[in-house]
């Protein structure tokens, strides 16, 4: 609720500080990263015996990792803090936010909003932390710290590579080259609209939109016409 309540203010802060995106789209991203994420995960069991196959004598056991280091990008700063904090706490872990230097104000403010709300709801003090010394050396020290159990790295190729090379377990996310395929029977105007909407959302700052279009033979002229 705190994230949604402050969603517009934080979205405007992010655009003003970074110069990336549209604040209206970032409001939606903040809602996706907080309220909708929470509604999806709130009833999930994440710790203890998650499933049991008595026939095969296989049990799936969920165990918290410990301390998670979360690298936050400048393109999606506030929503990424919300999402990573929520999934970390839900799975029984503590989290340390590492802000991008180009978005430190809005990231730190989002951290403060979440920290206050989480502690009011009963989260242990210190379960959510944020790096205040924002330098490459500080980030490197965090990534390589022996007490860090997992790194969640969102950002450019160099940063994700640094996380993978740190010696600690890491999950990295960055820009990809995702093609979309339009088949002959597709509703071409609708397909093109969806692709353009995806690509232009938040002025194209999302890592996951379509980067290219592959069409089935014979419909490329129609697709090109719709794109004009």
Where are these regions (language model features)?
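Conserved small-residue-rich beta-alpha loop and adjacent elements
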Residues: 42-117, 121, 166-170, 177-178, ...
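Short acidic loop-to-helix transition motifs that present clustered carboxylates
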Residues: 133-137, 157-159, 177
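Glycine- and Gly-Pro-enriched alpha-helical subdomains that act as flexible
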Residues: 108-109, 120, 134, 138, ...
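N-terminal Rossmann-like NAD(P)+-binding subdomain of aldehyde/semialdehyde dehydrogenases
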Residues: 1-57
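ALDH superfamily catalytic-core signature
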Residues: 90, 160-228
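A structured beta-alpha segment of the ubiquitous adenosine-cofactor-binding alpha/beta core
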Residues: 47-60, 129-148
